[in-house]
């Protein structure tokens, strides 16, 4: 299919491309990192459910941290929750933040014009290893393909009991951690979550796959202290 390249950047993780094409008469926005497709605006149901399910698990999620900005659908879904008073979004790639600051994407304006939004250029995984300077009611994370398929080898230690314990220190009491994954629920990771959090649940989110004509699924893990 013919596409328009909206941005191209060399990054430490590879060539990052934002492009737009038409599918069934509508604009579709896609992100590629090297040869891998990271995300498409055709498939955002599970990204939005990451916010909905994560915030629903908390009684009063005033302060939210989103790990991974991407096309912005998780962040904007979080802002739709009136209980959220502030939302910090962390992304390791300044180009991605720039796309939204330039309002290149469908949800960019709603995201950057909301006074509750703060966009931060930082490595989310490195941030979780540091002593917390701020704590949050909910952490919503969508960066890697899954717990076993990371975009960078440096992310792997996050998906361990030690990594999850360090992350949990950034949560307030009764705080919630929610994670998107492209894979089915993984019992080994569910067991790790259960060692760190008081309650855990794995949600399988189904959505129509307009390319295959079938139904696809993602997983949203939700865990609460």
For each predicted feature, which ranges?
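The AdoMet/dcAdoMet-binding core of the Class I SAM-like
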Residues: 44-173, 196-206, 214
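Conserved beta-strand signature within the Rossmann-like core of class I S-adenosyl-L-methionine
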Residues: 174-181
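A short, structured beta-strand/loop element
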Residues: 25-39
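A short, polar/proline- and glycine-enriched secondary-structure boundary/capping micro-motif
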Residues: 40-43, 190
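N-terminal auxiliary segments of SAM/dcSAM-dependent transferases
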Residues: 1-29
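Class I S-adenosyl-L-methionine
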Residues: 183-225
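Glycine-rich, charged/polar anion/phosphate-binding loops
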Residues: 3, 16, 125, 205-206, ...
């Amino acid at each position: 299919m013919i596409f328009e390249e909206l941005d191209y950047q060399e990054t430490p993780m590879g060539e990052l491309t934002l492009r737009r094409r038409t599918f069934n008469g509508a604009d579709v926005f896609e992100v590629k990192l090297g040869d891998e497709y990271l995300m498409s605006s055709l498939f955002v149901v599970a990204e939005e459910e990451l916010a909905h399910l994560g915030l629903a698990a908390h009684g009063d999620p005033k302060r939210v941290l989103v790990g991974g900005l991407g096309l912005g659908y998780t962040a904007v879904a979080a802002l739709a929750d009136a209980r959220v008073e502030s939302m910090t979004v962390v992304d390791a790639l300044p180009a991605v933040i720039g796309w939204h600051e330039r309002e290149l994407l469908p949800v960019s304006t709603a995201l950057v014009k909301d006074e509750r939004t703060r966009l931060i250029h930082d490595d989310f995984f490195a941030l979780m290893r540091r002593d917390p300077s701020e704590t949050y009611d909910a952490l919503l994370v969508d960066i890697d393909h899954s717990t076993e398929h990371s975009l960078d080898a440096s992310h792997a230690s996050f998906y361990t009991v030690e990594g999850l314990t360090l992350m949990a220190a950034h949560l307030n009491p009764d705080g919630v951690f929610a994670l998107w994954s492209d894979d089915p629920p993984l019992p080994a990771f569910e067991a790790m979550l259960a060692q760190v959090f008081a309650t855990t649940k794995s949600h399988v989110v189904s959505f129509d796959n307009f390319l295959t004509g079938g139904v696809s699924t993602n997983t949203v893990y939700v865990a609460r202290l």
